């Protein structure tokens, strides 16, 4: 029960952070999406240990686990544009497949690098 409550709180904090960054981006008329700026800021805060990973880890893990659910509204919205899909469907599909492949390869490579680095760090600290 405590873990569930902590997860919900962390998701709420991530949501508030995202809304705040989107608001700031809109208020300052920045042409970069708030989500991109938010990721960079969150990464920077985590890197410099201003925010501890434990403060957002459970919520972020749940959001990543349920990521597919967040794409359903977008997929349903595509149905409304059947004429565009019939005209450019193959091109759109090609872009989606290639970009998905690039993201998967990049994510897998980065995850392996991080895991190796973490393992190396744990090995060095256990030897000391």
Curated annotation (Swiss-Prot):
InterPro entries: Holin-like_CidA, LrgA/CidA
Compartment(s) where it occurs, according to its Swiss-Prot or TrEMBL record: Cell membrane
Top-level taxon: Bacteria
Annotated membrane topology: Multi-pass membrane protein
Entry's transmembrane regions: 4-24, 27-46, 59-79, 88-108
Assigned GO CC terms: plasma membrane
Annotated GO biological process: cytolysis; killing of cells of another organism; programmed cell death
Record key words, sorted: Cell membrane, Cytolysis, Membrane, Transmembrane, Transmembrane helix
Transmembrane helix keyword on record: yes
Pfam families listed in its UniProt record: LrgA (PF03788)
PANTHER family cross-referenced by the UniProt entry: HOLIN-LIKE PROTEIN CIDA, HOLIN-LIKE PROTEIN CIDA-RELATED
Entry-linked HAMAP family: CidA
Family that this chain belongs to: Belongs to the CidA/LrgA family. CidA subfamily.
Function description: Increases the activity of extracellular murein hydrolases possibly by mediating their export via hole formation. Inhibited by the antiholin-like proteins LrgAB. In an unstressed cell, the LrgAB products probably inhibit the function of the CidA protein. When a cell is stressed by the addition of antibiotics or by other factors in the environment, CidA possibly oligomerizes within the bacterial cell membrane, creating lesions that disrupt the proton motive force, which in turn results in loss of cell viability.
Protein name as annotated: Holin-like protein CidA
Organism: Bacillus velezensis (strain DSM 23117 / BGSC 10A6 / LMG 26770 / FZB42)
Lineage: Bacteria, Bacillati, Bacillota, Bacilli, Bacillales
